[in-house]
Amino acid sequence: MPGNIPSEIRGQKYISLTTFRKNGAKIATPVWFGEDGDKLYVMTRSDMGKTKRIRNNSQVRVAPCSIRGKVTGPEYSASARVLPPEEHAHARQAINRKYWMARLPLIWRRTDTYLELSFL
């Protein structure tokens, strides 16, 4: 059902977030994510490749994966957006609820932006 987080993604520890270069090449990255309603939230840095690629092409693919990025389930289409600073607190709370390590100041020191993923 469009807009809902697939059951294969809910409750997973990691997802493989696939973004696309301008030439169409796929780049997959295993990431932590938080869930809230029908959205996923990912923490990252604004100078990371995935953030730059999402600014150019908001279409992404999402699949459950291992810590090393080995995909363990079906892949789903989603749309991603880089959140403005006023929406960071909400994304941070979603991630903090899931990962105790995310609450450590050291983790957030290097994080300066968040992504919101919506399933198509």
Question: Predicted regions span which residues?
Answer:
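Short, structured beta-strand-loop surface elements
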Residues: 47-114, 120
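Extreme N-terminal tail/first-helix region
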Residues: 1-15, 72
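Covalent nucleotidyltransferase core used to form phosphodiester bonds in nucleic acids
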Residues: 5-6, 40-44, 48-53
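Short beta-strand segments
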Residues: 12-45, 62-64, 74-76
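Short helix-to-loop capping/linker segments positioned immediately adjacent to catalytic or ligand/cofactor-binding
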Residues: 4, 17-23, 101-107
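Generic recognition of long tandem-repeat/solenoid scaffolds
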Residues: 42, 116-117
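Short, structured patches in soluble enzyme cores that scaffold and shape functional sites
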Residues: 19, 118-119
